[in-house]
């Protein structure tokens, strides 16, 4: 389906936090007057959304996709503009066998990305740091504990690489540290 759209694709994957992150990104797009369409592992399939776009072209459209490891098993040419990795933990090992196989399946999402793409990843996850190294896409790390990355957090704010506050922690309505991590992504 990605072959048939020129609209940017943001693909979100990870063991936890995918749905929340997709919803946050969709709201961010809407606030910038970009129509976002959520699809993938939730709601109407991405392919059906693209078919609708072909029949009724729209401008200022972005696809925000929730991607599971299962969906990556059959993908040949998928190439998002932005790939987001929330975290990786030993899930679905009954299907993938080992953690290495699970990580490799998650990496299928970025194998076709070039240097015009972005990989946003949780730099608190050592497996993700190793997994994304060497990709042509630009790496955009975020962290709940490390500073000096593209996005980090302190007791008061989500900060940019330059240390400038981007958003106050108090302004985030979602409770829990895991949701702060989702916001960073």
List PLM regions with ranges.
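Adenine nucleotide phosphate-binding catalytic loops in nucleotide-utilizing enzymes
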Residues: 96-100, 137-185
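Phosphate-binding loop of NTP-binding sites
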Residues: 1-123, 127-136
């Amino acid at each position: 389906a990605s072959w048939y759209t020129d609209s940017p694709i943001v693909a979100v994957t990870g063991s936890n936090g995918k749905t929340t992150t997709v919803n946050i990104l969709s709201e961010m797009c809407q606030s910038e007057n970009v129509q976002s369409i959520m699809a993938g592992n939730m709601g109407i399939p991405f392919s059906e959304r693209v078919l609708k776009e072909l029949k009724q072209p729209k401008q200022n459209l972005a696809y925000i996709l929730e991607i599971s490891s299962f969906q990556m098993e059959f993908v040949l040419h998928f190439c998002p503009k932005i790939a987001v990795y929330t975290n990786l933990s030993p899930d679905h090992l009954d299907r993938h066998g080992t953690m290495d196989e699970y990580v490799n399946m998650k990496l299928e999402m970025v194998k076709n990305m070039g240097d015009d793409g972005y990989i946003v990843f949780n730099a608190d996850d050592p497996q993700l740091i190793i997994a994304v190294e060497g990709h042509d896409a630009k790496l955009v790390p975020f962290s709940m504990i490390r500073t000096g990355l593209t996005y980090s957090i302190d007791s008061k704010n989500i900060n940019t690489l330059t240390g400038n506050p981007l958003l106050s922690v108090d302004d985030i309505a979602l409770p829990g540290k895991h949701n702060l991590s989702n916001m960073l992504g």
